[in-house]
C-alpha cells in the first residue's frame, strides 16, 4: 500500500500547523484510499520517524515524503536526507522516496501568482 507524508518545518505557535491540517483534510477527501500523515522537522509532532512508524503499523509499503517548503534551503539539503536515511534504516521493508520542495513546482508557483492577482 502507498502513502504520503507532508513534511513541514514546525513552529512554536500551534496555529502555524493549521494549513497543514487543511492539506491533510483535502488529501483525505480527494484520495480516501491513500493514507496521509503530517511530520515536522522540529518544534512540532509527529517527527518524520513517528509518521513513518505510524504508516508502517497500517501496512504501508511505499511512502512518498512531500516537503512542504518553499525552496531547498539548508534543512532540506542537509538535515532532511539524514532523517530520511535514518527512517529507511529503521524500516527496511518500506520504500521511502521524496519529492522536491513544493515551492519548486511550477503549478504551486502559478497558484501563488494567481492568489496575488485575485488580491488586486
Regions found by a protein language model. Give the residues of each.
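Active-site-proximal alpha-helix that buttresses catalytic centers in soluble enzyme cores
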Residues: 1-120
Amino acid at each position: 500500500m502507498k502513502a504520503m507524508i507532508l513534511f513541514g518545518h514546525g513552529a512554536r505557535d500551534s496555529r502555524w500547523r493549521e494549513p497543514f491540517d487543511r492539506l491533510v483534510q483535502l488529501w483525505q477527501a480527494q484520495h480516501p484510499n491513500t493514507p496521509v500523515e503530517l511530520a515536522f522537522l522540529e518544534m512540532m509532532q509527529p517527527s518524520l520517524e513517528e509518521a513513518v512508524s505510524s504508516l508502517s503499523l497500517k501496512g504501508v509499503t511505499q511512502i512518498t515524503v512531500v516537503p512542504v517548503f518553499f525552496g531547498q534551503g539548508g534543512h532540506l539539503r542537509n538535515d532532511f536526507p539524514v532523517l530520511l536515511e535514518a527512517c529507511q534504516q529503521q524500516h527496511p521493508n518500506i520504500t521511502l522516496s521524496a519529492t522536491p520542495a513544493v515551492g519548486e513546482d511550477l503549478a504551486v508557483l502559478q497558484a501563488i501568482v494567481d492568489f496575488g492577482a485575485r488580491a488586486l
